[in-house]
Amino acid sequence: MTDGVGRFIELYQKEFNEDLSALRIPGNTLQNTVPPDRLEKVLQFPHQKGFFKDLPIKEGCREVIQQLQERYEIYVATAAMEFELCFTDKFDWLKQHLPFIPWTHIVFCGDKSIIGTEYLIDDAERNLKTFTGTPLVFTAPHNAHLQEYTRFDNWQDVADYFLK
């Protein structure tokens, strides 16, 4: 739904005055891209107030989710427990970008395996591998190695899968 990788690149540039765009290369992660002496500081970026507040929405996300909502009951599950300052930012982001999703269909959780839906679209392997329904991977550089899931490279792929 958002470009979290872009936020890491932006904050890295501000903090170290260096480019981290290599993070966008498929297969790259923070752990294999950031110099070891900076990694601990970079891993703290999402723990800062405001990290999630104004993340850009991915192209097509709003339109496709709105179309999906006409055929399916849509829930947004976000793993918010890891980053204690993100609740308000994430909720405000959802109200701004997906105002048609009712608050009753927004789930803040730590472990997405509790979500009892038919499908889960996620970029994190830890969420996909514990999901009991059909896990679907949304492409991000850190999950390029995943081969066992149906993969969506963009929101048009999601529309093609569910709306055709």
Model-based region annotation:
Residues 5-9, 76, 83-87, 114-116, ...:
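Short catalytic/ligand-binding loop motif for oxyanion handling, primarily in non-cytosolic enzymes
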Residues 77-91, 95-114:
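A short, structured active-site edge motif that brings together acidic residues
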Residues 105-131:
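Conserved Lys-Pro-Asp/Glu-containing loop-to-beta segment of HAD-superfamily phosphomonoesterases
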Residues 121-155:
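Acidic, Mg2+-coordinating phosphoryl-transfer loop and its flanking beta/alpha structural elements
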